[in-house]
A protein has these predicted regions:
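Small/aliphatic-rich secondary-structure junction motif
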Residues: 1-53, 76, 131
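General small-molecule cofactor/ligand-binding pocket signal
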Residues: 32-34, 85-89, 137-139
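Short, acidic/small-residue loops that bind anionic groups at enzyme active sites
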Residues: 131-141
Length: 141
């Protein structure tokens, strides 16, 4: 059993990561931080015009590094108390989250939800709510 949290390439995921970590500690289970990235090669923001394109392995490594950094930034010193793994998936975000939740036997899936004017759930949240194999918790960004 695990707790899965969706992580975006923005600081907005911090609250979701913190809450997911609390849930993982409470449930005495592993936190799995998931980031989806485009299946096309060379998606990284590090790629500039004229720079060499990245391979798929490079893309995965960059996404995993971003995930580790996001968890570390969100949890600070508390990251040492939480057992966590990172999973980078070359797919659409909703499908990636549901797939990881299924394969990792998730007890809970945590997502950052839109706030402000965009309080309506986005397409990723809608997909996850319809297809997740476990309860879904949305956290305001």
């Amino acid at each position: 059993m695990t707790v899965v949290v969706g992580v975006k390439q923005s600081p907005d995921s911090r609250a979701a990561i913190r809450l997911a970590a609390q849930e993982a500690l409470y449930r005495d289970t592993t936190l799995i931080a998931v980031m989806a990235y485009p299946a096309e090669r060379g998606w990284s923001p590090a790629v500039r015009p004229g720079a060499e394109r990245l391979t798929r392995a490079d893309d995965r490594t960059i996404a995993e590094d971003l995930l580790h950094q996001a968890v570390s930034d969100a949890l600070g010193d508390a990251a040492e108390r939480v057992e966590y793994r990172v999973v980078a998936v070359a797919d659409l975000a909703g499908r990636a989250l549901v797939h990881v939740a299924q394969t990792e036997d998730a007890q809970l899936l945590v997502l950052a939800a839109r706030s402000g004017i965009a309080k309506v759930l986005g397409t990723v949240s809608q997909y996850v709510l319809r297809n997740a194999p476990c309860p879904v918790l949305t956290v305001p960004e």
